[in-house]
Every structure is written in C-alpha cells, then in structure tokens.
C-alpha cells in the first residue's frame, strides 16, 4: 500500500522516472546496430592448399589427409569437411558457438605448421586459411568491366589493389576474386617443332627458368662512391621471351619463338566471369562470422569512392549485388507493423473505455515501456533485427494488458463514486498481485528458452530477453505511472460517451449478459465441458504430430544463388557456353534485376550464379515462385543443370552445395560409397517431397590412363620422373618462372599449345630425350586408354563422404522430406558400411524437432512453479494452466488453415500463447479467491461473479493482444514470411482460447475445489475414528 502511495501522491517524481526511462531508451535506440537476425553464425575457418596439376585423389591422399589429421586435434571443432579437386584442396572447420574465432585461427595456423613436413614438397605455397564460410552467400558483389583492358588486367587491378583494401575493412572476412586469373606470360609449345629440333620440354623449361633470374648482384666501391650493380637478368613480357635461345641445333640457334607461341595472357585461361552478358571480374565479399552485415556493407560503400580513384577511368566498378537493401526494407516493414500494432491496441482501449482522457493513460504507458526496452537491448549487446522488433510488436499487447487491468479496476471504483486518488490507491492495491502474477508467469515462459543451447537457443535468446524486459518495464510503469495518471487525470463520475460509441457500449453489455446466461448453463453441465477439455488435449497431440514442420520459414531476401552442374567430361569452352545460355534465360525473366556468374578453375564442369531480384514492390511473385517458373525453362538446356535456391539469412554448415538442404553419406569403404551413392540419389530424385536432387560425388570424369612399361623404359634410358615431368610440362599449365613487378608477382606458364591438344592423338606427339640424347616417343614405352576418374574427393572427419543436396517443392515441408528420405533408405536396404545423416540446416532441424516438446513442457512446468509459489497452492496453477490446450488447438488449426508449416517462429508463438491465455484465468481465479475469503460466497458464486466482473478486462486484454498480433498476419512486403507464422499462431490461439476458456476455466476451478475439499475431509474422519 505504501509502495503504491509513494508514486500516486508524488506525481513529479513519477513523471521524471518515466521520462528518464524514455530518454535512456531513445539513446539506446540510436546506438543499436541493425541486422536481419540475431548473431547466430557458427565460427568457420576455411583452409586452402594447392598443388597445380595434381589429381583429386592425389590431393585428397597427400594434402587433405595430413592436414585433416592435424586440424582434427583442435579443441572445439564441431564439424570438419574437405573437398579435393584438380590441383586444390579446401578444408572447412566449423567450431562450437562459444569458440572465439581469433583463438581458433591461431590453433589452425599451429596445426598447419605441424602438418607442413608431411605435405608434398612441390607445393608452390604453404596452406592458407580464411575466417569466412565459403557456403555463405556474399554480402556484396562488385564487378569490373572495361572495353579497353583485358580480363587479366582487370583481375590484376581487382586482386592487387581492390581486394587487399576491402579485406582491411572491419567485418570483411574474405574477398574472393573470380572471372579470370592474374596476368602471365604463356608459352604454348609446338611438339612437332620441338621434335624436329631435338629439344625436350624439360630443355625449354630449364632455359626459360635460367633466363629469368632475380638475384642480388652486390655493389662496387671506388673509394669515394658506391655503385649498386644492376643487370638485365629479368624478362618481363612475351616479346622479351620470344627471341630467347633455348638450344643449338647443328650450330644454329633455336629460339623460343621458333618452337612456341608466346603471348601476354593469364595464368589460367580456363576461367570466365560475366555480369548481364558482359565479361567481368567479380569480387565476392563475405563477412566475418561475428560481423554485422549492415555495418560491413555501409563501410564498404563508404570506401568505394576511394577505390574508384585507385583504378583507371576506363574501368567501370559497379555493385552487382548488395544484400542490405532487402534487410533494411524488411526492418522498415517490422517498424511500420509495430506502429500499427500500437495504434490498434490503443484503439481497442478507447472502444472499451469510451473516454479520451482514460485512453491517454495506456497511450503513454505503452510507448514508455517499449522505448525503455531499447536501453536494455543496447546494454545486452543486441541489435535491431526482425526477431527483436517482432518481440516489441507482440509486447504491445502485453504491456497494455497491465495498464488495462489497473486502469479498468480504478475506473470501476470511480464509477462507484470513489474519489480519484482513493480509487487509484484502492484499485491498484486490489490488482497489484494480479498484475505481478501475470507478468512473472509470462516471463517464466521464456526461462527455458534462455537455457536452450545451440543455434535455436542463440536465435531465440534476443527475442525472449527483449520481450521479458518489455514486460518488466511494463510492470513497473503499470504500478507507478498508470495509477498516478488515473488518480490525477480521471474524474469521479461516469465518463461521457460519444453518441457513436454508445452502440459499442450496449453491445458489450449485451455480450456480458449473454455470457452470464450461458455460463449458468455451463456450470450445470460441467461433465460436458470436461469432455471438451479432454478432447482439446487429444486434438493438440494429433495436430502436432500431423502438422508439417520445418526449421525456419523460407525467406524471400530478393537474392537467388545458383549452382551449375554439367556433364563431368565437358570442356571449358562448352561450359562457358552453358553459363552464357543459363544467364540469358534468367536475365530475360521480368522479375530479375541483375545476374552475375562465373565458371572455371579447378572444377571445369561447375559454375556459380548470383541473381538479384527486383524489389518486392516491383514484382508480384515470391522468390520461390520465380524459382519454380525458371526451373521449367532451365530444364530445357541439355547437358547441364542449374539448381536455384533463395539465399537465406540463416545457413548452417560449411558445405558448398547446389540446394538448401543436405543429406550426407559416410563410409570408410570408398568403393561401397561410390556404389551406393548413385542408387540412393536416383531413389531420392523420384520422391515427390524433394526437388533439385543433386550430389557432390563426381566420379565419372573422363581420364586418360597411362601405363608405363618399366622394362622398356629402363632399356631406353628413361625414368618415371622424366616421363611424369613430360606430361606436367605439356598439359599441366606448369608455372616455371616468376616475374617480379613492383605491385605483384606474375608467372610464366608453359604447356603444349591448345591447338595441338584437341584430341587424344596429342599424346602420340609427345617424346622424351633419354640419357643418350635421343628423342623417344611416349608411345614406345607407354600405353593409354580412356577411363573414369573422380573430379572431386570429399571427406567428413576422416571418412569418405558424399553429400546429396535437395530443395523443397512448393507445398512440401522439411519434415515431409526428412520422413521420405528415412523411408527410402530403409526400402533400399543400404548396408551398415554406408551411413546416412542430415547435415547443415537439416541436421539442426532434426535436433530442434527432438527438443521442441521438451521445451514446451519445460515452459509449462516453469509457469506452474512460479504460479504455485505466488498462490501458495498446488491446485490453482492447474486451473490457470487449463487454458493452454484450447490455445494450442487454435494455433495449430490456424497454421493448417494458412498452409504454414510449424517452424521455430511458430514455436515462439506457442510459447507466447502459454503466457497470454493464462492471463484470463489469473484474473478469474484472483477475484474468485478474493470473493471467497472476504465476500463469504460459495465457490460457484465466487467464480461466477469473478467471470462477470472480469469479463470486460478479459475482453480488452485479449483483443489488445489479438490486434497487436493482427498486423503480423496481414503484413506483406519484405520479411513478411518471418512475421506471418508468429501472427497466425497467436491470433489463432487467442480466438480459440477466448471462445473456450471463458467456460472451461470456471468448470476446472470448481472441479479442483471439490477435489480439494474431498481430500481435506479425509484426515478429519480419520481423527474422529
């Protein structure tokens, strides 16, 4: 009583306290960062190693395996995957959430150093690592195009000047440059000319290497001066290499230009990048796992004018893709939804109270509670993201509830003739415990979420804390500011109604009277109500089991990512043509704004595409509908497939795949894995629950298998090293020398001119110079035949692995796909030597599925404990919790009605309903207990009176919560796919619970009261006896 009086009778102090809360909130709001979702990225480090010309199997056994054994000893590694392809290996290390990325990077470097002695000696450089997840979509893509400069020169500008500068920007984890390679001098050898001159490929390589040497020459001193010695020991351009003498034949000089075509070109000619049908160099920028995407993008944009000045004017630097506009648009939509929710909630209060003066009170209390929450969010290190802003939107209905309960009770005393200040004190005292119970039990719902681990726990923590803080501030405001304003602003008379609102008042009275009559009938037919209540419990279980489930709603971020997978024996020239064809099909779609892509490198038969869609306001279709439309057109392209997926804000795992979800096959027997993977993939491709089924296992690449006749080689004076060196020199794009320039180093690349390698007959033109100086054709000591070989070798941990990726067809959920895959694996009878498990997002979904029911039960148990402590009763909490089954039925039915799967967002809605719907029961039970203690009423009379007296505040609080959530359901635009499941769940649950709990709660109250009396009499009878 003294606590309430302290604030009611000291209005200045109370107002200043509220102003202080508001000012702190405004300051916090201005300093809060902006993000699409809470920070949930796993710490990921990518290790890269290269050995030019090495086969995928060689890379896997000699490079990947030693590194994996060393890296696998690092503490906190939750997943390690590797992929080895032609000349390169990439190992992805995913760490536990609590592992510091910088500490992990130091351990990775130490592990690389420890494995160095086990790696092949021919590697051109040590393995390197980057603190970025290569499977994440780039946050920004920059393109360089020019009508003047070559692709190699553009790549040089990008990798030498732009990429290092961008990498230094805070938040940037990796800048991947694609579309070409560094400039180089290429030596294309003519094997017939070499044979005619008696010159071996090793002779050419040695001559070039010896002619381009950069060594210190020292200095001369003559007593008074010091002279630095400088020579022309370096060759820089193709023109300088052409006259190089590589051999003498019968006294005549054989120059490099006589036996080869020497050009200024690039290190790897098998690379291509394009943007909107124009050749381009791509800079794909990815952020650090812990970085804020908006701040990082803003920093890059601020740096662009400076970057533009460092490159020639003839080079056009453009932003091809930027993830931030859709994120900002989504957050703006949520902010608008929040404002609409506040307006609707205040309108509900006005309709019920029918007084502008009284409506001002919650109209002040709600903003103070919400704005004050921003200060706590800043102190907790949170951000303004979709989930935290949705928490505030939902909190609108909660925070007004507290003010409504206090305001309505004070208004009731005023209408009875009590003086304002006395009414404020008396009314607040009567409902103070009710408001406390409602708030604490609501916060208790989120305690299990705060203790939840893994990705779901990280994702939901900001939502739970934000909502809990808003409720806590609301509790303070409703017990301080609200009664003070009531005491000083409201008048001791019945408020005048506007004529247009009298009809609503009469309707409310009629509803209350109708409810009273129906409640009398229900209290006389309690068994029927009990059956209905049990039926709702059973229906909850059935609906939860049957409803489709997924991990997270499919987002429309306005960005698509596509992976091209062509025939494994395709040439680079044909693959470049496929890239152009696919890009034209996509570019012609009316919903597409920009398309960028590249192909080449170590995997000739694959490519990547990044597609930016037009803003949501300029297109009528969702990203998934656009993918469905494009899928039909893309299927007509022969010899290659383009798999499209919408980029999501949450992606788990480091695997680069062509679809959103993965199923990984593991085996210690590589032969068994290669035997069963095609069978499993073909079976999964027939399932209607899956789409775009593809695999990263590529073991049907064309290979030319050479078999040496070692006896013949020994007789001819040839060793295996010389033969292998011949093949590497001829076909491996061998880097044989380095050209040093002030800004970078470039390579001299040697191979047989591609004009002479159009078919396998090129091998017949190869020869080796033996130890007697004779030219011995390769066909004399080797035989060859076509064979199949893997284009990539994949590991997970230390086991051979193959990952099958898939998307979901429209109308299918991840739970449908998961169940279908499990059935298919059982039907196929896959042996125990091949193990299958979901990976990435699908794996997190499986783990979340197992914990959802436990989480809901834990929330209910927590609420029960809190209510039991508050009421000092085992029974009354059960009465209050009896409101939950009807809410669950309403929520699940609403999801079914809107064809929305049960996701993590819907789970949040269920948790919120546990806190919302019990408020009705709390108000009924509180007043019933008060009437029994002080009004000398029977339990039935007490609960009946409580239901009628609390009918208006129950309707007000329920409608306030419902209208607070309704904008989430009706909202469109960016990010609506995240908001709608939450709104659907809450609105559906509230409607159903409001219809049922007004009747079930009094019946359950009387049932437990009779049960209490029955058990309380038994001890007395025993004593009497």
UniProtKB/Swiss-Prot annotation:
Keyword rRNA-binding: no
Cellular localisation: Cell inner membrane
GO molecular function, one term: xenobiotic transmembrane transporter activity
Entry keywords, A to Z: Cell inner membrane, Cell membrane, Membrane, Transmembrane, Transmembrane helix, Transport
Stated induction or repression of this protein's expression: The mdtABC operon is transcriptionally activated by BaeR.
Family membership: Belongs to the resistance-nodulation-cell division (RND) (TC 2.A.6) family. MdtC subfamily.
PANTHER family on file: MULTIDRUG RESISTANCE PROTEIN MDTC (PTHR32063:SF34), PTHR32063
Assembly, per entry: Part of a tripartite efflux system composed of MdtA, MdtB and MdtC. MdtC forms a heteromultimer with MdtB.
Stated name of the protein: Multidrug resistance protein MdtC
């Amino acid at each position: 009583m003294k606590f309430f009086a302290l604030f009611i009778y000291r209005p200045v102090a109370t107002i200043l306290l509220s102003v202080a809360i508001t000012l702190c909130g405004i300051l916090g709001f201005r300093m809060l960062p902006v993000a699409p979702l809470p920070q949930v990225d796993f710490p990921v480090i990518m290790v890269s190693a290269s050995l030019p010309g090495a086969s995928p199997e060689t890379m896997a056994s000699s490079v990947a395996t030693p590194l994996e054994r060393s890296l696998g000893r690092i503490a906190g590694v939750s997943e390690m995957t590797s992929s080895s392809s032609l000349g390169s290996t990439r190992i992805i290390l995913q760490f536990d959430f609590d592992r510091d990325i910088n500490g992990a990077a130091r351990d990775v470097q130490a592990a690389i150093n420890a494995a160095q002695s086990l790696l092949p000696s021919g590697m051109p450089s040590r393995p390197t690592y980057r603190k970025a997840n290569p499977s994440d979509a780039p946050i920004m893509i920059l393109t360089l195009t020019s009508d003047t400069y070559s692709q190699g020169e553009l790549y040089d500008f990008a990798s030498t000047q732009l990429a290092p500068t961008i990498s230094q920007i805070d938040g940037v984890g990796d800048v991947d440059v694609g579309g070409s390679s560094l400039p180089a001098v290429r030596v294309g050898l003519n094997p017939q000319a070499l044979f005619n001159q008696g010159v071996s490929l090793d002779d050419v390589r040695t001559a070039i290497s010896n002619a381009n040497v950069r060594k210190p020459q020292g200095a001369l001193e003559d007593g008074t001066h010091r002279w630095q010695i400088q020579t022309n020991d370096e060759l820089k351009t193709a023109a300088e290499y052409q006259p190089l003498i590589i051999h003498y034949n019968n006294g005549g000089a054989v120059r490099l230009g006589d036996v080869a075509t020497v050009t200024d070109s690039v290190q790897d000619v098998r690379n291509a990048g394009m943007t909107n049908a124009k050749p381009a160099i791509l800079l794909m920028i990815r952020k650090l796992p812990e970085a804020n995407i908006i701040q990082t993008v803003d920093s890059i944009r601020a740096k662009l004018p400076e970057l533009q000045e460092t490159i020639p004017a003839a080079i056009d630097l453009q932003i091809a893709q930027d993830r931030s506009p859709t994120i900002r648009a989504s957050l703006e939509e949520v902010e608008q939804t929040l404002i609409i929710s506040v307006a609707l909630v205040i309108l509900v209060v006005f309709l019920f109270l029918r007084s502008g003066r009284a409506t001002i009170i919650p109209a002040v209390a709600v903003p103070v509670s919400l704005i004050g929450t921003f200060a706590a969010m800043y102190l907790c290190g949170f951000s303004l993201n979709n989930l935290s802003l949705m928490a505030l939107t939902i909190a609108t209905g909660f925070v007004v509830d507290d003010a409504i309960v206090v305001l309505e009770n004070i208004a009731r005393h005023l209408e009875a003739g009590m003086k304002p200040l006395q009414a404020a004190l008396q009314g607040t005292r009567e409902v103070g415990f009710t408001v406390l119970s409602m708030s604490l039990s609501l916060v208790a719902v989120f305690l299990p979420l705060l203790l939840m681990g893994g990705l779901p726990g990280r994702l939901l923590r900001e939502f739970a804390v934000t909502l809990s803080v808003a409720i806590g501030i609301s509790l303070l405001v409703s017990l301080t500011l609200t009664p003070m304003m009531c005491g000083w602003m409201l008048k001791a008379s019945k408020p005048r109604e506007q004529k247009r609102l009298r009809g609503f008042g009469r309707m409310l009275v009629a509803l209350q009277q109708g409810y009273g009559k129906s409640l009398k009938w229900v209290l006389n037919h309690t068994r029927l109500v009990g059956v209905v209540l049990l039926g709702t419990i059973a229906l909850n279980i059935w609906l939860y089991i049957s409803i489709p489930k997924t991990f997270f709603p499919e987002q429309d971020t306005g960005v698509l990512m596509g992976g091209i997978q062509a025939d494994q024996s395709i040439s680079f020239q044909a693959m470049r043509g496929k890239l152009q064809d696919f890009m034209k099909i996509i570019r012609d779609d009316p919903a597409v704004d920009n398309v960028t892509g590249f192909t080449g490198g170590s995997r000739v038969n694959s490519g990547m595409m990044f597609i930016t869609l037009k803003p949501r306001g300029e297109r009528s279709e969702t990203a998934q509908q656009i993918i469905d439309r494009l899928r039909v057109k893309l299927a007509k392209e022969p010899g290659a497939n383009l798999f499209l997926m919408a980029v999501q804000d949450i992606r788990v795992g480091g695997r680069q795949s062509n679809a959103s979800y993965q199923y990984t096959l593991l085996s210690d027997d590589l032969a068994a894995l290669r035997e069963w993977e095609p069978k499993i993939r073909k079976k999964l491709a027939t399932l209607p629950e899956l789409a775009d089924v593809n695999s990263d296992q590529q073991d049907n690449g064309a290979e030319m298998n050479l078999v040496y006749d070692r006896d013949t080689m020994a007789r001819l004076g040839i060793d295996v090293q010389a033969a292998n060196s011949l093949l590497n020199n001829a076909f491996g794009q061998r880097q044989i020398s380095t050209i040093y320039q002030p800004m970078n180093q470039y390579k001299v690349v040697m191979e047989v001119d591609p004009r002479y390698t159009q078919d396998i007959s090129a091998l017949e033109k190869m020869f080796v110079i033996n130890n007697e100086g004779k030219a011995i054709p390769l066909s004399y000591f080797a035989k060859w035949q076509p064979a199949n070989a893997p284009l990539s070798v994949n590991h997970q941990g230390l086991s051979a692995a193959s990952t099958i990726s898939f998307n979901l067809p429209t109308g299918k959920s991840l739970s449908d796909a998961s169940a279908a895959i499990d059935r298919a694996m059982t039907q196929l009878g896959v042996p125990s030597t091949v193990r299958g498990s979901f990976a990435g997002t699908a794996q997190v979904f499986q783990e979340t599925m197992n914990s959802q029911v436990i989480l809901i039960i834990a929330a209910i148990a927590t609420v029960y404990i809190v209510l039991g402590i508050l009421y000092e009763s085992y029974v009354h909490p059960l009465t209050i919790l009896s409101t939950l089954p009807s809410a669950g039925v309403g929520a699940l039915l609403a999801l079914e009605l809107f064809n929305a799967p049960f996701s993590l967002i819907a789970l949040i809605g269920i948790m919120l309903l546990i806190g919302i719907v019990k408020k009705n029961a709390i108000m009924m039970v509180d007043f019933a207990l008060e009437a029994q203690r002080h009004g000398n009423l029977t339990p039935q009379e007490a609960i009946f009176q409580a239901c009628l007296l609390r009918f208006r505040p129950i309707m007000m609080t329920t409608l306030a919560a419902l209208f607070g959530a309704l904008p989430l359901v009706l909202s469109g635009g960016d990010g609506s796919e995240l908001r709608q499941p939450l709104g659907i769940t809450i609105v559906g649950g509230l409607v159903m619970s409001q219809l049922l709990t007004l009747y079930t709660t009094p019946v359950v109250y009387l049932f437990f009261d009779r049960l209490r009396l029955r058990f309380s009499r038994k001890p007395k009878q025993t004593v009497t006896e």
